[in-house]
Regions:
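...with weaker cross-activation on analogous glycine-rich loops/strands in unrelated enzymes
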Residues: 63-125
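N-terminal capping segments
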Residues: 1-64
């Protein structure tokens, strides 16, 4: 089955309430998934998992990433891959299922990523 925005959002919604702090295994469920694909480092407890979670949500039933450039664990890498593929869009044009990146500390380097559920023009959910 191919990946759709609805499916990605359903997978994301199915994880509401998950906490890596309550996970009895090392790291996060998304870090362990990413580690199976890319190396053990990503399974460590202290590794932030937002990009790995986004990558997990945007992987089809055959295990193929539908993200430009494939899975990513570092938000700026995902941005660079989207830019290189000509798929970087202004947040005001983001559609449900698109990835949206945030620069929480205002240093010019994005440090968080999530999935757009809805776009209301001046803000996204």
């Amino acid at each position: 089955m191919s990946m759709t925005a609805s499916k990605a959002l359903a997978w994301a919604a199915s994880q509401i309430g998950y906490s890596r702090w309550d996970d009895p295994l090392p790291g996060s469920v998304y870090g362990r998934w990413y580690a199976e694909r890319h190396g053990a480092y990503y399974c460590e407890s202290g590794v932030p998992f937002c990009a790995m979670f986004a990558s997990w949500c945007l992987t089809d039933d055959d295990g193929n990433s539908v993200i430009p450039g494939g899975d990513f664990a570092y938000v700026p890498y995902g941005i660079n891959a989207a830019r290189a593929a000509g798929q970087l869009v202004d947040p005001s044009n983001a559609a449900p299922g698109d990835l949206i990146c945030f620069d929480w500390d205002g240093d010019g380097l994005a440090d968080h990523v999530g999935l757009v559920e809805a776009n209301y023009g001046s803000w996204v959910q």
